[in-house]
């Protein structure tokens, strides 16, 4: 998958908190834990689980996740 966003950081899913509508995903990038808030549906469609390798995509207005 090719993205136009240039701020892409490789990390590992460390925390998943599923709510009724939203999901909080904690991703370890080096010594840092970055949290992304995405829809629960997106988290389920990506089949995210602890230990998954993901990319954190940071734009000026949002933080997104990509799983290859």
Please place each PLM-identified region on the residue numbering.
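Non-catalytic connector elements of ABC transporters
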Residues: 1-68
